[in-house]
Amino acid sequence: MKIGSHVSNAGDLMLVGAVQEALSYDANCFMIYHGAPQNSYRKPIEQLRIPEYKELLVKHNIKIEDVIIHAPYILNLAQSDEEKRQYAVDFIIREVKMTAAIGAKYIVIHPGSSLSLSLADGLVQIIKSLKEILAATPGLDVVLTLETMAGKGTETCFDFSQLKKIIEEIHSPRIKVCLDTCHTFDSGYDWVNDYEGVIEKLDKTIGIQNIRVIHVNDSQNTLGSRKDRHANIGQGNIGFVTLAKICHDERFAHLPKILETPYLHDESGKKVYPPYKQEIAMLKANVYNENLIDDIINNR
């Protein structure tokens, strides 16, 4: 099973620190942002410690294509404001070039919200934006991996058919999909009671062959709520059994599965505890840990 989590590449260790954090969770894949997801500051390529990072990946048998990049979620490729849309396009072009520089293959992108536009017009803007990004990065083996969204507000791409339209309109091997379990559940796909039905819809519209990454998250919300609130594995409305089923599904065996579940806090709200080591162990074993929360807090 390929399974890992979001990790940090901040501080002096940079990419080396990201690999070390992933290893501390017994992960064999991981996801990073090139910088803080809420701003545009990025450190120079020369400071990222790329040679050491690549050596560490080889040493621990982590394939470089299983290092996933996530673009900042503040960018919006769907909007009508041309200046803001162009800013998002230009920023993602830089992110794609940085992704290529570190040897990664997949960058996950939130497609965007249509805001004042209709959904159909928002999709037109996304298609236009993605074509511009591809045109500006020829020859780079980096795949733009569009995330399935929950449909919060005016978010696009909460329905598989919307992603199908984008894929068919652009018709490029560099446009693929990131399947998010929380988002799809919140948008109305019933993984719990209609697992094979969801798989069938996925395959008939997007095509399983077009999935490149899976975000494995439980959901704090009810089916079809269109709210997007992640929960720890087994602590939400999707539940451990269904999420483990996805992780162990042979149809997804080749795909990196990335946890984006929330950190836990102590009673003061100040100290935080990453849940990933315990959640990864639980999913690998395919056995629910009744003491999950205590084990996370006590790092057992």
What are these regions (language model features)?
Residues 10, 258-275, 300:
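A short, acidic, flexible beta-alpha connecting loop/helix-capping segment that sits on the rim
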Residues 81-94, 119-132, 159-168, 195-200, ...:
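Short, electropositive alpha-helical surface patch
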